[in-house]
């Protein structure tokens, strides 16, 4: 299998430690519901530290290693992966800190009215008065709900932090890369 486009690789988590003696790795997922990671058949690992959000560099491409996933399961809020070719604890420990990436095309189809946060990044955000608030720069979790960071995507300057709840996010139009929000431009 060839390396997917660098723009298409999405970071899903990082290996935090070895799990057991048989070469399993414990992954700290970035998502509270790591459905894509749990269903993956192939993952890519990068041992380089995380840069800013966005495309991987060509240097990073040269360090990517592909692994077939033999099994994946949840355990105490982490994902435990069994990777082909990693058969003992020492091999698993050598991967500690590696970032787990998955080809976006390998994600399972999102359920109706559900979205992968990565697909929201880069969307324009407008309010009900048709004022453009900016671009979606990031989406994070605060424990209660998602939070959308909106601002200038080219400089990563955040102007608004908006709760990702149905009372605020009125419409998500992924084909047109547009979110409609019940949010005033003077709310900071």
From Swiss-Prot:
InterPro entries listed in its UniProt record: PRC_barrel-like_sf, PRC_RimM, RimM, RimM_N, RimM_N_sf, Transl_B-barrel_sf
GO terms for cellular component: cytoplasm; ribosome
Pfam families: PRC_RimM (PF24986), RimM (PF01782)
GO biological process: ribosomal small subunit biogenesis; rRNA processing
MF-aspect GO terms: ribosome binding
Location (main, coarse): cytoplasm
Subcellular localization: Cytoplasm
Coiled coil: none
Keywords attached to this entry: Chaperone, Cytoplasm, Ribosome biogenesis, rRNA processing
Chain ranges of the PRC barrel domain: 112-187
Recorded family membership: Belongs to the RimM family.
Domain notes: The PRC barrel domain binds ribosomal protein uS19.
Function noted in UniProt: An accessory protein needed during the final step in the assembly of 30S ribosomal subunit, possibly for assembly of the head region. Essential for efficient processing of 16S rRNA. May be needed both before and after RbfA during the maturation of 16S rRNA. It has affinity for free ribosomal 30S subunits but not for 70S ribosomes.
Subunit record text: Binds ribosomal protein uS19.
Protein name: Ribosome maturation factor RimM
Organism this protein belongs to: Polynucleobacter asymbioticus (strain DSM 18221 / CIP 109841 / QLW-P1DMWA-1)
Lineage: Bacteria, Pseudomonadati, Pseudomonadota, Betaproteobacteria, Burkholderiales
